[in-house]
């Protein structure tokens, strides 16, 4: 079957990853040690997309856990799902990257990368038909950003024809974890533009907003944020893991979502967003799901789709949903909001259906949008980058690890190019219409 190899790097990547594995273990009826306790054959049918079957009826995640310091890995190992993972798949250094992209990409990370690739090869060789890789990491730190992008480029080199999907936590507008975040993020985007096939952008601030505004949680913690991310990750891969009427996989998703190779940065969303206790008090309908799914407030990245236009959209519905109803809803969204979709891609919404809902819900939908408004996010990081880079602030930490200023300049201009490409396609197609109007009047 179409296996996916999962990598999680750095503190953020490992925490999101741990949350993701607990979510999909539950969906497939596995307990915290990987023993199958489920009731339905459907849970077993495509278990091997993410799990290897081990002796004694245990299932082991095809997951590789990577960090440059042992702390986060110890936390995962001692957590509720610590016994799920294969012990050989924990690869960690001792020194840490100290939020320094250069350490993750060139010095500390480069020393560890070969032992990670050995584990990647071992996992890939055990697959029947490897579909691709997915990696969870953040772009603001040292390990997830620096070493994460190093791994992506190494895997790209070795498996050029396999899909590479990344779940990347991008820096937030107001909440900054580290001062050098803009540097790390810009250097990472520079890599992702070239080496990733699809990048799902997530940011903490948008997640906080959802937790507080929609879920009414008084003080959300990282556990709540990671829960939202894992819901989306589970939704995106649901068609691979369960039979459905309209199946999609990483490659089909990319073919439908990426009109130009560099523009593969997606905004994601999920519906229904209900707090843990309240979802039993309302019934869900497809129109409600669709409305919530397209609602700008529920996007998990801080860029407002109303400020741009959608190039393409994918909607993945789960549960007992009528195919016709979904098609009608999607059609009506495009009709009513046609100004928010580019007119030079006629049917730019792709739908997929899967008959098995997530745990505790009757139906759900996952939203993936390739919107030109994502440029806001890159623009914001770029402005912060150039403000610091103009003064060469903090640069010695990077040049001390052997980096050159030239690399910073290249990364900056690559990101500026990306922003202007998004701008160009946002207004493309409008110009021709203006000329047509003139002709009609004459």
From Swiss-Prot:
Q: Which residues bind GTP?
A: 11, 69, 138, 142-144, 204, 226
Q: Where does Mg(2+) bind?
A: 69
Subunit arrangement?
A: Dimer of alpha and beta chains. A typical microtubule is a hollow water-filled tube with an outer diameter of 25 nm and an inner diameter of 15 nM. Alpha-beta heterodimers associate head-to-tail to form protofilaments running lengthwise along the microtubule wall with the beta-tubulin subunit facing the microtubule plus end conferring a structural polarity. Microtubules usually have 13 protofilaments but different protofilament numbers can be found in some organisms and specialized cells.
The protein's UniProt keywords, in alphabetical order, are:
Cytoplasm, Cytoskeleton, GTP-binding, Magnesium, Metal-binding, Microtubule, Nucleotide-binding
GO biological process terms on file: cytoplasmic microtubule organization; intracellular distribution of mitochondria; mitotic spindle pole body duplication; nuclear migration by microtubule mediated pushing forces
SUPFAM superfamilies recorded for this chain? Tubulin C-terminal domain-like (SSF55307), Tubulin nucleotide-binding domain-like (SSF52490)
Query: What family classification does the UniProt entry report for this protein?
Result: Belongs to the tubulin family.
Q: Name it.
A: Tubulin beta chain
Describe the function of this protein. Tubulin is the major constituent of microtubules, a cylinder consisting of laterally associated linear protofilaments composed of alpha- and beta-tubulin heterodimers. Microtubules grow by the addition of GTP-tubulin dimers to the microtubule end, where a stabilizing cap forms. Below the cap, tubulin dimers are in GDP-bound state, owing to GTPase activity of alpha-tubulin.
Task: Provide the species name.
Answer: Pneumocystis carinii
Protein origin, superkingdom: Eukaryota
Cofactor(s) required, per the database record? Mg(2+)
Q: Where in the cell is it found?
A: Cytoplasm, Cytoskeleton
Q: Which GO terms describe its cellular component?
A: cytoplasmic microtubule; spindle microtubule
Per its UniProt record, what Pfam families does this chain match? Tubulin (PF00091), Tubulin_C (PF03953)
Q: Which GO terms describe its molecular function?
A: GTP binding; GTPase activity; metal ion binding; structural constituent of cytoskeleton
Major place of localization? Answer: cytoplasm
């Amino acid at each position: 079957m179409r296996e996916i190899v999962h990598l999680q790097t750095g503190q953020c990547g490992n925490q999101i990853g741990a949350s993701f594995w607990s979510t999909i273990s539950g969906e497939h009826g596995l307990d915290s040690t990987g023993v199958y306790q489920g009731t339905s054959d459907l849970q077993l049918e495509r278990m091997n997309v993410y799990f290897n079957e081990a002796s004694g009826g245990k299932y082991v995640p095809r997951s590789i856990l990577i960090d440059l310091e042992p702390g986060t890995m110890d936390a995962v190992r001692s957590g509720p799902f610590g016994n799920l993972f294969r012990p050989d798949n924990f690869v960690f250094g001792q020194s840490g990257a100290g939020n320094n992209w250069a350490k993750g990409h060139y010095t500390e990370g480069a020393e560890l990368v070969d032992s990670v690739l050995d584990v990647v090869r071992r996992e890939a060789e055990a697959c029947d038909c490897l579909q691709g890789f997915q990696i969870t990491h953040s772009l603001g730190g040292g390990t997830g950003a620096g070493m994460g992008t190093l791994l992506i480029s190494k895997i790209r080199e070795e498996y050029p024809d396999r899909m590479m999907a990344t779940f990347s936590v991008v820096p937030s507008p107001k909440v900054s974890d580290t001062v050098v975040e803009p540097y790390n993020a810009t250097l990472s985007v520079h890599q992702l533009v070239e080496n990733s096939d699809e990048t799902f952008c997530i940011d903490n601030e948008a997640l906080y907003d959802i937790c507080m505004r929609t879920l009414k949680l008084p003080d959300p913690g990282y556990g709540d944020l990671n829960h939202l991310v894992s819901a989306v990750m589970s939704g995106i891969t649901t068609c691979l893991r369960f039979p459905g009427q309209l199946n999609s996989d990483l490659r089909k998703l990319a073919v439908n979502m990426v009109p130009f190779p560099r523009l593969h940065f997606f905004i994601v969303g999920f519906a229904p967003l209900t707090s843990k206790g309240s979802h039993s008090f309302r019934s869900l309908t497809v129109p409600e799901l669709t409305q919530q799914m397209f609602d700008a407030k529920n996007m998990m990245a801080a860029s407002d789709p109303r400020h741009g236009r959608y190039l393409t959209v994918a909607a993945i519905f789960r549960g007992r949903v009528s195919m016709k109803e979904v098609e009608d809803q999607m059609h009506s969204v495009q009709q009513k909001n046609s100004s928010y979709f580019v007119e030079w891609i006629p049917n730019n919404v792709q739908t997929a259906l899967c008959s098995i809902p997530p745990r505790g819900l009757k139906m759900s939908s996952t939203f993936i949008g390739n919107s030109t408004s994502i440029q806001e996010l890159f623009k914001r990081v770029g402005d912060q980058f150039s403000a610091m880079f103009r003064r060469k602030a903090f640069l010695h930490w990077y040049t001390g690890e052997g980096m050159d200023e030239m690399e910073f300049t290249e990364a900056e201009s690559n990101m500026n190019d990306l922003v202007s490409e998004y701008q160009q396609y946002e207004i493309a197609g409008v110009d021709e219409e203006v000329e047509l109007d003139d002709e009609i009047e004459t």
